C-alpha cells in the first residue's frame, strides 16, 4: 500500500510539473503602433536598406511589383513561410498580379534570408510586428487588399484577416501552418522543451548534400537551429489562442496538398487545415465564396517554380476566386 501511494505521489507530482511548465510561458504579443510612411515607396526603400545592412541573400529581399503609380483596384500582399522567402510564392503570385494588373508586395520576414543565427534569435513578436506593419502600409498600393500566405505566412495571414476583417477583401491560404505533423513538436509548448529537444536531437537540423545542391537552397534555410522552431511554436500558440477562425469574414480560398494517407503534406497538418476551414465556415459570418481546393499533385510548397505542383489547377482556381470576389469578367491569358 505504501509503495502504491509512493508511485501515485510521483505520478501526481510529475503531472503537476507538466501542467505548470506547459502554461509557464504563454506567448504574448501586442502590436506597437508605429508612424506609417506618407507613401509606399519610402517604406519600401527603408526595408531594402535594412535588408542590405543585414546582407540578405540576393532574391530573398523584399520585392515590389507595380502596375500603377497610383492605387490599383486591389493589391496583393504575399507573406512567406518559416525559413523561406518570396521564391516560395513568386511563380503563381507574379502571374496573378500580371493578369489582374495589381500592385504586389512580397514581405521579407525578420530573421529570413540572412543567416541561421539571425533566424534562431528572431522572436515571433518581431515577425508578427513586421507583418502587421507591412499589411497596414500595403493599403497605399490598392483600393482593396488580397492577402496570400504560405505555411507560417498562412498562419500570419489568418491572424491579420481575423483582426482586420474590413481590410482583408480576399484571403488565400496556401498550406497554412496550424499544427505540426510530428507529434513530438508539442514539446516546444513546455518551458523546458527547447533545451530537451537540443539534447535529444542536437542543436541544428542538418540538410543532406543533395538538398544543398538544389538551386532552391538559395531561398530557403536548409539547415536550421531547432531553437528556431520555438519561435514558430510560440507564434502558433499565440495566434490560435486568439480564436481567429471565429472572426474571419473575408472570402477565403484554401489550398492543401493531399492525394492519400501516404502522399500528403508532411510539413503542416492537413487535418488541422480542414478543421480550421470548417470553423471559419461555421462562424456565422463566413463568405459563400469560401472554397477548399485539394491539390493531388504537389507538396507543402505549391506556388513556387522550385517545387512541382499542379500550377494549372492552382492558377485557374485562384483566378476564378478573385474574379468572383471582385465581380470581374476578364478573359485572362498567360502570355
Where are the language model's segments positioned?
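Gly/Ala-rich beta-loop-alpha elbow adjacent to hydrolase catalytic centers
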Residues: 149-157
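The alpha/beta-hydrolase serine catalytic core
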Residues: 32-61, 176-244, 295, 302-311
Amino acid at each position: 500500500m505504501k509503495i502504491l501511494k509512493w508511485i501515485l505521489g510521483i505520478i501526481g507530482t510529475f503531472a503537476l510539473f507538466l501542467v505548470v511548465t506547459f502554461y509557464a510561458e504563454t506567448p504574448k504579443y501586442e502590436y506597437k503602433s508605429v508612424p506609417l510612411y506618407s507613401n509606399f515607396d519610402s517604406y519600401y526603400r527603408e526595408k531594402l536598406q535594412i535588408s542590405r545592412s543585414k546582407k540578405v541573400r540576393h532574391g530573398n529581399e523584399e520585392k515590389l511589383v507595380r502596375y500603377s503609380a497610383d492605387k490599383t483596384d486591389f493589391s496583393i500582399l504575399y507573406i512567406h513561410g518559416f525559413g523561406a522567402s518570396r521564391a516560395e510564392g513568386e511563380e503563381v503570385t507574379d502571374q496573378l498580379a500580371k493578369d489582374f494588373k495589381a500592385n504586389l508586395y512580397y514581405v521579407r520576414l525578420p530573421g529570413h534570408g540572412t543567416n541561421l543565427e539571425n533566424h534562431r534569435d528572431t522572436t515571433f513578436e518581431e515577425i508578427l510586428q513586421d507583418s502587421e506593419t507591412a499589411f497596414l502600409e500595403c493599403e497605399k498600393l490598392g483600393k482593396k487588399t488580397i492577402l496570400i500566405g504560405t505555411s507560417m505566412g498562412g498562419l500570419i495571414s489568418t491572424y491579420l484577416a481575423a483582426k482586420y476583417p474590413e481590410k482583408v477583401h480576399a484571403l488565400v491560404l496556401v498550406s497554412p501552418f496550424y499544427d505540426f505533423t510530428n507529434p513530438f513538436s508539442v514539446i516546444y509548448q513546455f518551458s523546458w522543451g527547447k533545451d530537451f529537444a537540443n539534447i535529444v536531437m542536437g542543436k541544428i537540423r542538418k540538410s543532406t548534400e543533395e538538398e544543398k545542391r538544389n538551386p532552391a537552397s538559395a531561398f530557403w534555410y536548409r539547415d536550421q537551429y531547432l531553437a528556431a522552431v520555438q519561435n514558430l511554436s510560440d507564434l502558433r500558440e499565440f495566434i490560435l489562442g486568439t480564436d481567429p477562425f471565429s472572426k474571419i469574414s473575408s472570402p477565403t480560398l484554401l489550398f492543401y496538398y493531399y492525394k492519400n494517407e501516404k502522399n500528403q503534406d508532411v510539413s503542416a497538418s492537413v487535418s488541422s487545415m480542414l478543421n480550421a476551414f470548417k470553423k471559419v465556415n461555421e462562424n456565422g459570418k463566413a463568405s459563400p465564396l469560401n472554397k477548399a481546393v485539394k491539390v493531388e499533385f504537389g507538396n507543402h510548397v505549391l506556388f513556387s517554380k522550385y517545387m512541382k505542383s499542379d500550377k494549372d489547377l492552382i492558377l485557374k482556381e485562384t483566378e476564378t476566386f478573385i474574379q468572383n470576389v471582385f465581380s470581374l469578367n476578364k478573359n485572362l491569358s498567360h502570355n
